[in-house]
Regions:
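Non-catalytic terminal accessory segments
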Residues: 1-124
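Soluble catalytic domains of enzymes that build or remodel membrane lipids, polysaccharides, and related
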Residues: 136-374
Length: 374
């Protein structure tokens, strides 16, 4: 999709420039007595840290960009405080002390953030929502489990080694319906991971069925050519008893309607309108609306959607960059939102993480929605 220069070369140039910036910033440290006696410490320590940073950042799509981003942010904050102190008349000794802290503290804070973000990413939660409706439901209730934005790989929060944990949490919810709202796989997914997760979906007992809508990564080549194709995905889903919905409306025997939309980005917006998916408009059938990206909520509600389930945002994943980017493009970043008196939207934070085992915003979760007829 993108030229290799913008994907890989430009990020490396930017990473190198930031490394040099951090090195120069570190040299602002005052030449203390120990440093004066051992000049190698004054120049060698920041150089060593710069080399460490360069090693961490060797993959422009990896965790290094997150590490550098936090480190630069903390450096800027510290330097800003030091310059402010100088401007308001702080003593030279005090200002130098701030500069010293500006050299050491960002590394300590960044190390803590990286540790905490990893723990947060790897903690798989079950998030439960309770909704009521006046429409008829099978046995007066409906329980839906939503899986979204998994993309399994060794460097991310979810891979085949965590399938037993995921299976246990899904089974504990006892779903009537299993829905997979896109980006379950991506262009970095290996065939073995595809097969393992499709096998998992086949093992899940969901009496009312299992449904899948595509996201912008499942078959869309953002970064590289994937090692599997559409036929492989369709075959794996079919074997697992999962139905792929692409601008499709399905009526279940129990009277519940499932609508699955094509992804907006994957199709460049070339998809059916909400009204075209339910030509008759709202009726007395409870309608579950699956759309990978949280957008077009009002039109979906007007067409007859009672519950909209989406993903895509990862709940922001890396604060604040993720929050700013997602809010700008989507109608909801994470969680539950009341669209109308009869329609509710829920956006998952993702059952995995994108790119790396790191999360400072949102939750790594499966979503369990309990709908009761009143």
């Amino acid at each position: 999709m993108y030229h290799p220069f913008f994907q890989f070369v430009l990020p490396r140039i930017g990473q190198a420039a930031l490394d040099v910036l951090l090195y120069v910033n570190f040299l602002q440290l005052p030449p203390l007595q120990l440093v004066s006696a051992w000049p190698v410490l004054y120049y060698g320590l920041p150089l060593l840290l710069m080399l460490l940073l360069a090693y961490i950042s060797r993959d422009p799509l990896g965790l290094g960009i997150v590490f550098t981003g936090h480190l630069v942010t903390f450096y800027c904050i510290g330097t800003g405080i030091a310059l402010l102190m100088r401007r308001v008349g702080g003593t030279p000794q005090f200002v130098w002390r701030i500069f010293w802290l500006d050299g050491i503290t960002p590394w300590l804070l960044t190390a803590f953030i990286m540790w905490w973000g990893r723990r947060r990413a790897l903690k798989l939660c079950t998030t439960k929502y309770n909704i009521t409706t006046h429409k008829k439901l099978p046995h007066g209730a409906l329980r839906i489990v939503q899986i979204s934005d998994v993309p399994p790989r060794a460097c991310a929060a979810m891979d085949h080694t965590r399938i037993p944990e995921l299976r246990e949490k899904i089974a504990a919810c006892r779903p009537d319906l299993l829905v997979l709202t896109g980006d379950i796989f991506d262009e970095f997914t290996e065939p073995e991971e595809l097969e393992a997760f499709c096998s998992l979906f086949g093992e899940i007992d969901a009496p009312l069925g299992k449904y899948y809508v595509l996201g912008n990564h499942d078959l869309f080549h953002h970064w590289r050519e994937p090692s599997f194709g559409r036929a492989d995905l369709e075959q794996g889903l079919a074997k697992a008893g999962v139905r792929l919905l692409e601008d499709t409306c399905v009526m279940l025997p129990c009277g519940v309607r499932i609508v699955g939309r094509k992804d907006y980005l994957y199709t460049n917006g070339q998809r059916f309108t909400a009204a075209q998916l339910i030509p008759g408009g709202p009726d007395d059938r409870y309608t579950v609306w699956l759309d990978h990206e949280p957008r077009d909520f009002k039109n979906a509600a007007a067409a007859g959607a009672d519950l909209i389930l989406s993903g895509h945002t990862h709940g922001g994943q890396v604060w604040p960059a993720g929050a700013v980017g997602m809010v700008a493009k989507n109608e909801r970043n994470y969680g539950q939102k009341k669209i109308t008196d009869t329609c509710t939207a829920i956006v998952s934070g993702g059952t995995g993480t994108w790119g790396y085992k790191f999360r400072t915003q949102g939750r790594t979760e499966i979503v369990c929605v309990e709908i009761k007829q009143v």
